[in-house]
Amino acid sequence: MKNILMTIKDCDTATITSPIVEKTLELASYRSSRVHIIHVAPPPRDPPYNIDSKMLRREIASELRHEHNCLQNLSKCMQDMNINATALLVRGSIINMVLHESERLAVDLIIIGRHRHGPLYSALMDGTDKGILAKSSCPIMFVPV
């Protein structure tokens, strides 16, 4: 396992002490693996007719800068712990982008944080994890968060 892709759903809650980060650090240090931290931002869309498009673009740019900084800080913390880590902020469909980047980077393992929810929530809202699981060509590890 030389290449690990760790997915981050929420940049604001991803810290060096997050369960998904701790598990990734454990695996990466044990195997001397490279870690690719990925966060997929939503694809660009047309603004509603009643919203100023310049204001919306500024707001989106500010949010993307914030997410990028969070990912870079997490990557830096991992590097300070002697883990070869890089951060990726991409835009698009979560399933497609995670699969695309996993193939492009030739990862050996995808690590995904998994929230504990009831069966109703899982039936209605959990398509991302199932989509990646169904289409991935490499192993996937789910970490409870």
Feature map (PLM): residue ranges:
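Glycine-rich, Arg-bearing micro-motifs that act as flexible, cationic patches
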Residues: 109-135
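Short, hinge-like loop/turn segments at secondary-structure boundaries
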Residues: 53-56, 104-106, 128-130
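General small-molecule cofactor/ligand-binding pocket signal
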Residues: 36-38, 86-90, 141
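Small/aliphatic-rich secondary-structure junction motif
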Residues: 2-54
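A short acidic, glycine-rich active-site loop
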Residues: 55-69
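Structural beta-alpha unit
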Residues: 76-110
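Short, flexible loop segments at boundaries between secondary-structure elements
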Residues: 135-145
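Local beta-strand N-terminus motif with an aromatic residue
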Residues: 1, 107-108, 138
